[in-house]
């Protein structure tokens, strides 16, 4: 059967493992997270293969991204949909607070000035994207994280996520100090 020493060692190792759970959960919820990107709105940057069911998985940096000063134009972010907080979108940041944006259909105005704490996001695949042209500027408080790199599939490691294939929609960039 079991000896007293082996059961004590098992109990000790189990308690050590359990004590790390809060640390790992805190890191996952507040610092870094791995997320699956679904859909075609970010093609060809993400999920370039439409004929397969393969999707890209990205490493998200979550710490401090709700502050727009920690975001840059052409960053790829995941955020909660402004119309349905249960839905998550992956888009590229095209405009920062105080930028003037040239909009596209279906946005009702030809230009929009981004207010404080709001950003403009668009998908790289314009014809298959529900983005700020549909729902307007989004509050930076909806941002979940910034995509740092592709972690799966391995064949996509090293893909430059800053390389935008979308349009340049800024007519006037804000001068931020």
Curated annotation (Swiss-Prot):
Pfam families the record matches: Peptidase_S26
Keyword Protease annotated: yes
Record-annotated disulphide pairs: none
Cellular compartment(s): Mitochondrion inner membrane
A Gene Ontology molecular function term of the record: endopeptidase activity
Residues at the catalytic site: 41, 91
GO CC, alphabetical: mitochondrial inner membrane; mitochondrial inner membrane peptidase complex
PTM info: The N-terminus is blocked.
Keywords, comma-separated and alphabetical: Hydrolase, Membrane, Mitochondrion, Mitochondrion inner membrane, Protease, Transmembrane, Transmembrane helix
InterPro entries, alphabetized: IMP2, LexA/Signal_pep-like_sf, Pept_S26A_signal_pept_1, Pept_S26A_signal_pept_1_CS, Pept_S26A_signal_pept_1_Ser-AS, Peptidase_S26
CDD domains reported for this sequence: S26_SPase_I
Main location: mitochondrion
Mode of membrane association: Single-pass membrane protein
Phenotype upon changing residue 91 to H/R: Abolishes enzymatic activity
Major enzyme class: hydrolase
Subunit and partners: Component of the mitochondrial inner membrane peptidase (IMP) complex which at least consists of IMP1, IMP2 and SOM1.
Family: Belongs to the peptidase S26 family. IMP2 subfamily.
Protein name: Mitochondrial inner membrane protease subunit 2
